Swiss-Prot record:
Residues 1-128 form the RNase H type-1 domain. CDD domains: RNase_HI_like. Mg(2+) 1 binds at residues 7, 45, 71. It comes from the Bacteria. It comes from Enterococcus faecalis (strain ATCC 700802 / V583). This is Putative hydrolase EbsB.
Length: 135
């Protein structure tokens, strides 16, 4: 089983956003920083999740059960209910649904921020890496 932990950080809302992704199996751990552009905090959470799935597919890690972990209740509830109340999130849900077809079993689980510290740290580092303060 592959566990994927994701989190996003945003400067402003909307603002420059970065994501952190942790891929965890029994044999390995991989950590990534990803730029997410200028989006709202909730959109950043959707975008980092989608990036995590795209990278899993590109690395051929999609031939196993995948458990996604996010501390964003909006993202998790949208995916679990298969419905985006906010129109802004509908394209993200549609993209998730397309990516989901590439996995034999893809599950998502909400977890508290206190249990997602590695992805949170990577997201904050991504902000510094991709959007350094301009002087």
């Amino acid at each position: 089983m592959l566990r994927i932990y994701v989190d996003a950080a945003t400067k402003g809302n909307p603002g420059e956003s970065g994501g952190g992704i942790v891929y965890l199996t029994d044999q390995s751990r991989q950590q990534l920083h990803v730029p997410l552009g200028i989006v709202s905090n909730h959109e950043a959470e959707f975008k980092v999740l989608i990036e995590a799935l795209k990278k899993a597919i590109a690395n051929e890690d999609n031939q196993q059960t995948v458990l996604l972990h996010s501390d964003s209740k909006i993202v998790v509830q949208t995916i679990e209910k298969n419905y985006a109340k906010n129109e802004k999130y509908q394209p993200y849900l549609a993209e998730y649904q397309q990516l989901e077809k590439n996995f034999p079993l893809l599950l998502i689980e909400w977890l508290p921020e206190s249990q997602n510290k590695a992805a949170d740290m990577l997201a904050r580092q991504a902000l510094q890496k991709f959007y350094p303060n301009k002087k």
